[in-house]
């Protein structure tokens, strides 16, 4: 009788574990096709939508003269990467589109990134080499996020979201990349989503 009870408990535990694993399936919240692009990163390398395909990537909008949300957003992205590194997750990239491309040359972007403790700089692509009007239109068409030059200052208004793009160039998730309370930035969720996506699709 005791053996039967023990086997029943073991079976119930196994079913519970398998159910939990089944719930881990990646679920896309969006299906937004990213527009083609080909730009220059902080290392002077050409980066295109096609060159990024095959791996998922995390994207955001920043600029180096930003005096408000960009520094904490960039820091938050380094925290995401730190947790990915600890988990041994390697099959991804990080892409930051400059929303002030006339100021943000590759050299300026490279210097900007040195202000942060970046676990793996090789996965970061800070992009520039296009016009202000281009990035304003691109942001709306590809990510449904606002980018708008402020004519009364040297600042640029832009979305504070991080976005997850799948291996085929489709935006599938968005997250708050900035919050007044840093604990409200869903770093663990981003890491979990990316890990689940990679496990199921690569």
Segments from the language model and where they lie:
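Bacterial N-terminal signal peptides that target proteins for export
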Residues: 1-8
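C-terminal motif of bacterial Sec signal peptides marking the signal peptidase cleavage site
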Residues: 16-20
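N-terminal "domain-start" segment that seeds a small globular fold
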Residues: 23-51, 72-76
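Short loop/turn microsegments at loop-to-beta-strand junctions
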Residues: 34-35, 56-57, 159-161
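Short active-site neighborhood of thiol/selenol oxidoreductases, capturing the structured segment around
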Residues: 48-71, 77
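Structural microenvironment flanking redox-active thiols in thiol-disulfide oxidoreductases
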Residues: 75-138
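Structural micro-motif
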Residues: 124, 136, 143-148, 156-163
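Thiol-/selenol-based redox modules, centered on thioredoxin-like
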Residues: 150-202
